[in-house]
Each structure stands twice: as structure tokens, then as C-alpha cells.
Amino acid sequence: MREVRAAAFVFFWALFASAAAPIASAPQAVPEGPRPSGAGNLYVVRYDRWTAQDERGFGEFITAIGESQCHTVNDCLHGGDNPFRASDPPGVHFESDCADLPYVLRAYYAWKRGLPFSYEHDVEPRGHTRDIRYTKNGNEVTARTDVLSFSPSGYTLLDAVRDAISSASYRIHPDLQEPLEPDLYSPAIEAKSIHPGTIIYDPNGHVATIYRVDPDGRISYIDAHPDNSVTRGFYDERFVRSRPGMGAGFKNWRPIGLVGATRRADGVYVGGHVELAPNDRIADYSDEQFFGTGKRPRDDGDWARGGFSLNGEAMDYYDFVRAKLAGDKLEFDPVKEVRDMVDSNCNDLHYRADAVALAIATGIQNQPEPERLPPNIYGTEGDWEIYSTPSRDARLKTAFKELRDKAERFVRMYEAGDPKLVYAGHDLVSDLIGTYDREAADCRVTYVRTNGSHVTLGYEEARLRLFDMSFDPYHCVERRWAAADPSELSTCRDGPTKQAWYAAERNLRNQIDRTYDAEMDFTLAELGTPGPGKGVAVPPDVDARRYLMSVRGLRPKNQRHVPLATARP
């Protein structure tokens, strides 16, 4: 591997000004099937750039993993849907958390295909910060590593990437290209630009990779967690927008090329260095996701004033994204939406069950409760990062809230006769209740109590317990699942101190906003007093069914029972 420091970096325009086509779309033939990776496990570069076909192949690789339903990074790369699995010995173990996963998958694919690869291995904060992962003004790239032929083994590369990358690596202003270019750029919100392989960065410290975009514009993603589990979900308001310096949102891999290398007779490129395309040489670079579709404000501080519109109609950002990815058309099939959201929430409950079971298996619940919470319960290190679930739980609660809010939105659209609603029935509310009940009835999640007995919760029971489920890894499994009935809770071995912590953490459980900038290293006594960073007293409404029951019988205004839109065949 070749290290590049900021002071030594020089961009060679010849790569992009040469007679060859731009590296983002060079019409280079690619052989069928996996490319050879060279002798042994060494990284061997056989192609000097990524072509459009390579990018499509990478997207197909990501889609296959996303659709495979693998549950750990190791399972994904050893699984039958990885076309390169036969080249990896059975004893090789793959790991990744959320920030590492996009890089691990990209580096792995580049290695197996013989493609050039380079990565930012050092970022520094722009201004003072307590934690570089949550800097107010973002970070800048100060050092890069080029991966050249025969420099590392592919497995060594994956380890090096995991050591170098954190969520801080994504927290970069879309305009910033100094001291060094970042690996990623901000793409236009277009169907051709947001695709499998595109990364989504949540500035609250989470990263996901898109594996599918449906015809109606709905985005499906995969993500990983500190326990190396892999989960799936739909893009929604859990991925928040924020000031441009934080670099939130969609990111694509910057076009790269190998320059100055010697091509041997066997086709292997030796030496050289990797160069990255600057923003102004990337056809679909755009900052609209930060500033809106109108004129960019002079000051980044005014970013939130930027609005989004399509075909003359003002839109919410998330609607805008969906409409653009659906061919500039925004439509909702409310029955399908509710069905999919209940199903997704059920999957998230199962993912949580796996995470809690993994924590319990380590015995951490038998350790004494520390005297203080971590400096921040959402962004920390060590056992708390691996085995606690405050971030996961907050995202789960947000998803339940979004289902409730979407249900109300669909009802209001139905009542108003909104043509964006694709519904061919005669009683939307009843159909939504029926769909909700059917999907909820099929959802069961089971946990193992301290004495080895099993408790199974239905979807509605889990929803009722949602804000009582402990995120604290030092609590018994019964409290992790909000057991309240004396018979269910009887096997919990938590003493008075842990019981007091559970009670004191209630307001933190009520909070769905992940406040990574808050100081939260409270003692038990401090947590019990009012003050910032201690949560909220009342949780949000997440009961979609109760809302739907409250509006039963509602009909569209000025209509009898005419469908609001023609259903698709």
C-alpha cells in the first residue's frame, strides 16, 4: 500500500484530459464472471480504472447481498449469493460495523475484480470537538492510502480499512476537496445516480448502503452494527438532514484511476498511484440535497431555508427524493405502504432480539452497573458501544412513529381526494386496519428469560412495551424486554441499584432523537434530577392502530366511494 499525505498530494489532470473516455464511463470490455485476483491472496491490479460496467457489477454484488437475507457480515461474504465466495478459505472470518461496511464491501469487490482502490485513512476535525465522529463543522481528509499490486493481501487490506474508517470518514462538506479529496461525493437526486451501492450517511452516527430502489422510488438498504450483525430497512426520516458541513445524505464513490503504473506482459499493473476525480469532473455531482432545488444561499447557515420542488409543486425533502427516483412522479399505495412498514418493524424487532441475545450471552448483565453513564450513550466505545441499544432502539421507535404518522397522512390524502394516492378500494381506513392486523398477527419475537424459559411477544405487545425496553446492557434480559408482570419479571436478578438505574433512565428511553452532542456521563443521583441530556418526560405517539380506529367510517369529501386513482395492473 502507498500512503499519500496532504502535503505531497498532486492531481494529474492527464488522467481525465487524455484521449481515453472519462473513468466514470469508459467503454472497456469486462469479462463474464469474477475476475482473477492474482496468485494467493495478494492484491493484484489488472485494470487501471473503474468503468461504468464495473460500477454496475458492484451494484449487482450489493443487491445480491442485500436480497440474500444474511444476518452477519461473515455470513454475507461466505454465503451463496457472493460470486467470489469460493476464493475465500472457510476459516476466514469477515467483520464490519456500520461505518466499515461500505468500505469493506467496496475493497473486497475491488480486490476480487483486480480493480484499483484507494481510501482515506486519516481525517481531522474542522474546529474543536470532543468526538471527531460528531463534529459540528465536519472533517477534512488529511491522508490517503493507495492499494497497489502486491502491497498487501486482500485480507490485510480489509483489516486496515476497518481500522482506518469510522463514521467520521463520512462527515465531510460536499464542496470540500482539500487538503485531499474524500472518497465519496454528493450525487444528484436522480434515478441514474441513486442506485445499489450508493451510501446513506446519517449524521447521528449511522451509515447504510442501498441495495435496491423500487419503481415507486422506495429505497431499501443494508447496514451493519458493532456486533457485526447485518440488518435491512427502508430509507425514511430516520436518516436526518443537517448542515452541509456534516455531510449528511447520499454519497457515491468518487471515480478513480491508476496513473503512472507499468502494465506487465501478464496484464498486471505495477506501481503508479491512484487519483480521484474532482467534483467539477463528475457529471452527476450536485449539492441539491443540502441546499434544495432553488438558488443556493450565500451562507451555509441558511441551508434549511432551501426548499424542494418538482414540476412546480413544493415538496417535503423525503417526498422529493422518492418522486425523483420514481421518474418524477410521487404516488403512494397506502395498503402496500402500511403492510411493508409493519413487516419492516417486525424485522427490526427480530434484529433487536438478536442483538440483546448476543449481549446476554457474554454475561455483561451480571456485571455491576458502572457509577456513571458513558459520556454519550449514543456514541461511545467498548462494551457499551457493542452491547447497549440506545441508538438501535431510537431508530426502532422512530420507525413505529413514522408508521403512525404515515397512516394519518394517507387518511388525510384519502379524505381530500389526493390523486397521489393509488387506491382502488371503497374504505381505506378499514383496509388499513385489516392490513395492519394481518401483518401484526404474523409477527412474533421470542426472548429467553434468565431461567431459560421462553417468552413470546406479538407485534402489538412489543409496541406497547417499546418505551420500557431497557437499552442498558447491564440490565437483565427481562428488563431489556420491558417485563412488568411480576411472574415474567420474577427471574430477573437485578438488585436495587440496577432497578434504580432502570427507573432513572425512563426519560432517556422516551427520547427518539439521538443527541450525540449532549454530555450524558451522569451518576444515578444526577440522572434523577432535571437538566439537559436526560431525555424527555413524554414519549411520542406510536400507536397507528389506535389512530386508524379513531377515524373508522371516514369517506372522501365530495365523493361517494369512487377510487381516488386508477390502480396499477
PLM segments and residue spans:
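Catalytic Cys-His active-site segments of thiol-dependent hydrolases/isopeptidases
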Residues: 203, 211-233
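Mixed-charge, low-complexity intrinsically disordered regions
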Residues: 22-167, 174-177, 266-569
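Active-site neighborhood of thiol-dependent amide/isopeptide-bond enzymes
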Residues: 181-189
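Short, well-ordered loop/turn sites that connect or cap secondary structure elements
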Residues: 188-196, 200
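Bacterial N-terminal signal peptides
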Residues: 7-18
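Positively charged n-region of N-terminal signal peptides that target proteins for export
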Residues: 1-5
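A recognition module on extended beta-rich or small alphabeta surfaces enriched in W/G with H and D/E
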Residues: 148-182, 226-273
